C-alpha cells in the first residue's frame, strides 16, 4: 500500500511541475508571435506568390493578437512561467509592447522594400518574428539560462536579417561584422554568467543578488564587468558601439529600423533585470560605470554624427547618443528615472521609425542614401519632407514634439537625483544633435530649385498603387502624427510609464532601498 502511494506521488509531482513550468498565461503574447512565425513559414512553402499574399495578414494577426494579450495582462496578477525563469510584470509588458509595435511598423515599411530587392517576403517576415520572439522573452527573463537563450535567439535572427540582401556586398559585410562582434559578446556574457553561478550556486537572478549582498567578492566585481559589457554591446553604448555604424549602413533599412528600436528596448530591459535585480550589492560601482558610458555615448554619438554623409550612418550615431540619454534614467534608479526610461523608449519608437519610413520611401524611389541627395526634396515630395522634418525635430527634442517631453522628463529625473554632470552633458549634446538634424531639414526645404540634387531633379512620379506602398504610407503617417501631436496629449504616456514602474516589484524594491540609503 505504501509503495502504491509513493508511486502515485511520483506520478503526480511531474504533472504539477509541468503545470508550473508551462504557465501559458504569462507567455500567451509570445505564443501568438510564434504561431505567426510558423504560419509565415508554412505559406512560404507554397510558393512566392502565395507567400507574398498571405504573409502580411498572418503577421498582422499574430502581432495584433500579441498587443491585445499584452493589454489584457497590464496591471493584472503578475504571472511567472518556465519554473520562474520568466515573469510578466508591468515592466516586461511595457517593453514587450514597444518591441511588438516596432516589429509591426517595421513590417509595414518592409513589404515594398523586400519586393523591390527581390527578397523572399515569407522568410524575411519569419526571421524578423523570430528576433521579436527572442526580444520579448528577454524582457521578462529572470534566470541566466533564459537570458542567454533569449539573447541568442534575438542575436542569431539579427545576424540573418543583416545579411539578407545576398547580392549586396555591404549587407554581407555587415552580417559578418555583427556575427563576429556578437559572438564575442555572447562568450563574454557566458564567462560572467559562469562566475555568478560558481559564486551563488544558482542561475536565478534574485538568488544571485541575495548571495552577492551577503558576501560580495572580487569575482563578483569581475562578473559585473563581463555582464555589463554584454549589456553595453546590446544597447550600442560607447566604447562597445563599433559594430553599429557599419551594420546600420550595410543592412536592409527595415532591419535597421527594428534593430534601432526593438533590439535596443530589449537591451535596456535586460540592463534593468540584471543590474537592478542582480547587482544591487554593487549599485555604486555599476552606476559609476554607466555614468561614464552615458557621457561617452552622448558625446561621441552626437559629435561624430555631424560628419556623416550617409543618412543611415547619421542615424546610427544618433542612436548611440539616444542610448546615452536613456541611460540617465537607469543611473538615477528612482521612480522618475525608471518611468522616464520607459516613456522615452515609447517616444523613440515613433520618431525613429517615422524617420526610417521616410528614408525607405526615398530609397525606393531614388536608390540613394546620401544626405546631399535630399537637397530640394520639398519640390518633388512634400510628404517625405514634412514627415522626416517632424521626426528629426522630435529626435532633437524641439517642443512641442513628443521627443521634447521624453527628453525633459529624463533631464528632470536626473537633476532631481543630483546627476548634474549627466544632465549638463545631455543638454549640450542635445544642442549639437539639433544642428545636424536641422542641417538635413534645411537642405530639403531651403535649397533653391536650381540647387536641387541630380537625384531630386530626376525624381520619379509618386505612385501609391504599387503593392506594398499603401502599408508604407500608413506607417509613415501614423508615426509622424504620434510624433507631432503626442507631446500635446502626452498624459496617457506619462501614466503608462508610471504604471510600468509601480506594477513591477523589482523596481519598487530598488526604489525603496535607494530612498532608505539616501535618508541614511
Curated annotation (Swiss-Prot):
Swiss-Prot/TrEMBL GO biological process terms: ATP synthesis coupled electron transport; photosynthesis, light reaction
Name of this protein: NAD(P)H-quinone oxidoreductase subunit 2
Function: NDH-1 shuttles electrons from an unknown electron donor, via FMN and iron-sulfur (Fe-S) centers, to quinones in the respiratory and/or the photosynthetic chain. The immediate electron acceptor for the enzyme in this species is believed to be plastoquinone. Couples the redox reaction to proton translocation, and thus conserves the redox energy in a proton gradient. Cyanobacterial NDH-1 also plays a role in inorganic carbon-concentration.
Native organism: Prochlorococcus marinus (strain NATL2A)
Keyword ATP-binding: no
Location of the protein in the cell: Cellular thylakoid membrane
Predominant subcellular localization, coarse grouping: membrane
Keyword NADP carried by entry: yes
Amino acid at each position: 500500500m505504501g509503495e502504491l502511494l509513493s508511486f502515485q506521488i511520483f506520478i503526480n509531482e511531474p504533472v504539477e511541475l509541468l503545470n508550473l513550468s508551462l504557465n501559458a498565461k504569462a507567455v500567451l503574447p509570445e505564443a501568438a508571435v510564434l504561431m505567426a512565425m510558423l504560419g509565415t513559414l508554412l505559406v512560404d512553402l507554397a510558393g512566392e506568390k502565395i507567400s507574398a499574399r498571405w504573409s502580411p495578414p498572418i503577421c498582422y494577426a499574430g502581432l495584433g493578437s500579441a498587443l491585445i494579450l499584452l493589454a489584457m495582462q497590464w496591471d493584472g496578477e503578475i504571472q511567472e512561467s518556465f519554473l520562474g525563469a520568466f515573469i510578466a510584470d508591468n515592466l516586461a509588458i511595457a517593453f514587450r509592447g514597444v518591441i511588438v509595435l516596432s516589429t509591426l511598423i517595421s513590417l509595414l515599411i518592409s513589404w515594398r522594400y523586400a519586393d523591390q530587392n527581390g527578397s523572399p517576403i515569407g522568410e524575411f517576415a519569419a526571421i524578423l518574428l523570430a528576433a521579436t520572439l527572442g526580444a520579448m522573452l528577454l524582457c521578462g527573463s529572470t534566470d541566466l539560462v533564459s537570458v542567454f537563450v533569449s539573447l541568442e535567439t534575438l542575436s542569431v535572427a539579427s545576424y540573418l536579417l543583416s545579411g539578407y540582401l545576398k547580392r549586396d556586398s555591404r549587407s554581407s559585410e555587415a552580417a559578418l561584422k555583427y556575427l563576429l562582434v556578437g559572438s564575442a559578446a555572447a562568450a563574454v556574457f557566458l564567462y560572467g554568467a559562469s562566475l555568478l553561478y560558481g559564486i551563488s550556486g544558482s542561475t536565478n537572478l534574485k538568488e544571485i543578488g541575495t548571495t552577492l549582498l551577503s558576501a560580495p567578492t572580487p569575482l563578483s566585481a569581475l562578473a559585473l564587468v563581463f555582464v555589463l559589457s554584454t549589456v553595453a554591446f546590446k544597447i550600442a553604448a560607447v566604447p562597445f558601439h563599433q559594430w553599429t555604424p557599419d551594420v546600420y549602413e550595410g543592412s536592409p533599412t527595415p532591419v535597421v529600423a527594428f534593430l534601432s528600436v526593438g533590439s535596443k528596448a530589449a537591451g535596456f530591459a535586460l540592463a534593468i533585470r540584471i543590474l537592478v535585480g542582480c547587482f544591487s550589492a554593487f549599485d555604486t560601482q555599476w552606476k559609476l560605470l554607466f555614468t561614464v558610458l552615458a557621457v561617452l555615448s552622448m558625446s561621441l554619438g552626437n559629435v561624430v554624427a555631424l560628419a556623416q554623409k550617409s543618412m543611415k550612418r547619421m542615424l546610427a550615431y544618433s542612436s548611440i547618443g539616444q542610448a546615452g540619454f536613456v541611460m540617465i534614467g537607469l543611473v538615477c534608479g528612482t521612480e522618475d528615472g525608471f518611468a522616464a526610461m520607459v516613456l522615452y523608449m515609447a517616444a523613440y519608437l515613433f520618431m525613429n521609425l517615422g524617420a526610417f519610413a521616410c528614408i525607405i520611401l526615398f530609397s525606393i524611389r531614388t536608390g540613394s542614401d546620401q544626405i546631399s541627395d535630399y537637397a530640394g526634396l520639398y519640390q518633388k515630395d512634400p510628404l517625405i519632407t514634412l514627415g522626416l522634418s517632424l521626426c528629426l525635430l522630435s529626435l532633437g527634442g524641439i517642443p512641442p514634439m513628443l521627443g521634447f517631453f521624453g527628453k525633459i522628463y529624463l533631464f528632470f529625473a536626473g537633476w532631481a537625483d543630483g546627476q548634474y554632470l549627466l544632465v549638463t552633458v545631455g543638454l549640450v549634446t542635445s544642442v549639437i544633435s539639433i544642428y545636424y538634424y536641422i542641417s538635413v531639414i534645411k537642405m530639403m526645404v531651403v535649397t533653391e530649385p536650381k540647387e536641387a540634387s541630380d537625384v531630386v531633379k530626376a525624381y520619379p512620379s509618386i505612385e501609391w498603387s504599387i503593392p506594398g506602398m499603401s502599408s508604407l504610407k500608413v506607417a509613415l503617417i501614423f508615426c509622424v502624427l504620434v510624433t507631432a501631436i503626442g507631446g500635446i496629449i502626452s498624459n496617457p504616456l506619462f501614466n503608462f510609464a508610471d504604471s510600468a514602474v509601480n506594477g513591477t516589484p523589482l523596481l519598487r524594491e530598488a526604489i525603496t532601498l535607494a530612498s532608505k540609503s539616501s535618508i541614511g
